[in-house]
């Protein structure tokens, strides 16, 4: 919005030429998101407490979690506001990729909102059935996939890190692949959201990493130099990623141990969906496995646990997702969180190294 209002005036006021630069707008989208979270956070937490929108705790979970019963949830609403508003303020709103990402982010957030609301209303931790949730997520992601496939400049090739010459053309099959990436990322972040600050930390790190990927993909000269896919218009997603970083930092202020508020599914599903969509658009889908390695391990731990129990009648972990396994081993919650953050930073650095290792 500000881009469209102020940049056209740059001939009369040369200082406004700065709105042309994605880096400037990404920085201020980050700051704007952070300020929105700081300002609205206390009000929202108080409102959620008054409405008794509290978290229900699994009865079979770690006993240390029982004290968290009733902590305000659905704090992801704050994250959504802090992402969407700065994005509308600072991005070029004629950019298709921005709207596709917002569609997934808000759409997944709406599914999460309904899920959280049902949990609170029914006073249990079940919410929407797995089938209902998956159906809606796949429908939204599928819509995004069709929109991208139908957009002529978008490429349906798949890029692999470390192998510059390996770029298979998926054609129409890119749509189900995009759905897999977007829905998979969303559910992986959702599974990670089990400890105070555990999910939002790696999300901030991943968002910052994809801010750089988006900027590079949108710059044809830099993309050619680094031998990565050039995606005209993808640079605007750097501004959206900046908003995600700011929103994440602002939310972490209230979500750090001991948490004053939980993001709920409205936050985790929308953040994961946004990351998956940005990975698809920037042609860094495979790299998401590295950047979001914490999310991948959390999701795999659940798959392994369920498969092992069904096939062998035994559980590999004391409890899944894997962060609960470490809790039951006696690790303090803050120790698990910070160590997972450290691993996430290392993985982000490895992912960034793929820009040169080709």
From Swiss-Prot:
Listed transmembrane segments: 26-46, 70-90, 94-114, 134-154, 169-189, 197-217, 234-254, 261-281, 286-306, 335-355
Upper taxonomic lineage: Bacteria, Pseudomonadati, Thermodesulfobacteriota, Desulfuromonadia, Desulfuromonadales
An example molecular function term from Gene Ontology annotations: phospho-N-acetylmuramoyl-pentapeptide-transferase activity
EC numbers: 2.7.8.13
Places the protein is found: Cell inner membrane
EC supergroup of this enzyme: transferase
UniProt membrane topology term: Multi-pass membrane protein
HAMAP family listed in its UniProt record: MraY
Signal peptide start and end residues: none
Gene: mraY
Assigned protein family: Belongs to the glycosyltransferase 4 family. MraY subfamily.
Function: Catalyzes the initial step of the lipid cycle reactions in the biosynthesis of the cell wall peptidoglycan: transfers peptidoglycan precursor phospho-MurNAc-pentapeptide from UDP-MurNAc-pentapeptide onto the lipid carrier undecaprenyl phosphate, yielding undecaprenyl-pyrophosphoryl-MurNAc-pentapeptide, known as lipid I.
Stated name of the protein: Phospho-N-acetylmuramoyl-pentapeptide-transferase
One Pfam family hit: MraY_sig1
InterPro entries: Glycosyl_transferase_4, PNAcMuramoyl-5peptid_Trfase, PNAcMuramoyl-5peptid_Trfase_CS
CDD domains: GT_MraY (cd06852)
A GO CC annotation given for this chain: plasma membrane
Alphabetized PROSITE patterns for the sequence: MRAY_2
Protein species of origin: Syntrophotalea carbinolica (strain DSM 2380 / NBRC 103641 / GraBd1) (Pelobacter carbinolicus)
């Amino acid at each position: 919005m500000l881009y469209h209002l102020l940049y056209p005036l740059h001939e009369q006021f040369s200082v406004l030429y700065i709105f042309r630069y994605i880096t400037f707008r990404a920085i201020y989208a980050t700051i704007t998101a952070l300020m929105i979270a700081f300002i609205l956070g206390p009000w929202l937490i108080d409102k959620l407490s008054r409405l008794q929108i509290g978290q229900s705790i699994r009865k079979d979970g770690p006993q240390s979690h029982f004290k968290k019963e009733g902590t305000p949830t659905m704090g992801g609403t704050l994250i959504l506001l802090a992402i969407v508003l700065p994005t509308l303020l600072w991005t070029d709103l004629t950019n298709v990729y921005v709207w596709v990402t917002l569609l997934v982010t808000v759409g997944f957030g709406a599914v999460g909102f309904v899920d959280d609301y049902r949990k609170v209303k029914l006073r249990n931790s079940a919410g929407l059935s797995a089938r209902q949730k998956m159906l809606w997520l796949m429908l939204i992601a599928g819509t995004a996939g069709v929109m991208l496939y139908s957009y002529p400049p978008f490429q349906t090739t798949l890029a692999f890190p470390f192998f510059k010459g390996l770029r298979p053309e998926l054609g129409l099959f890119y749509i189900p692949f995009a759905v897999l990436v977007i829905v998979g990322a969303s559910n992986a972040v959702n599974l990670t959201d089990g400890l105070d600050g555990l999910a939002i930390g790696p999300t901030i790190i991943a968002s910052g990493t994809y801010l750089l990927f988006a900027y590079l993909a949108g710059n044809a000269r830099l993309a050619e130099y680094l031998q990565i896919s050039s995606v005209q218009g993808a640079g605007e997603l750097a501004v959206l990623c900046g908003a995600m970083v700011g929103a994440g930092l602002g939310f972490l202020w209230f979500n750090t141990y001991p948490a004053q508020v939980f993001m709920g599914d409205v936050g985790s599903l929308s953040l994961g969906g946004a990351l998956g969509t940005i990975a698809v658009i920037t042609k860094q889908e495979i790299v998401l496995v590295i950047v979001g390695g914490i999310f991948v391990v959390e999701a795999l731990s659940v798959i392994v646990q369920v498969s092992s129990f069904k096939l062998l009648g035994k559980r590999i972990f004391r409890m899944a997702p894997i962060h609960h396994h470490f809790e039951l081993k006696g690790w303090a919650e803050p120790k698990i969180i910070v160590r997972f953050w450290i691993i996430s930073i290392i993985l982000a650095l490895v992912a960034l190294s793929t820009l040169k290792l080709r």
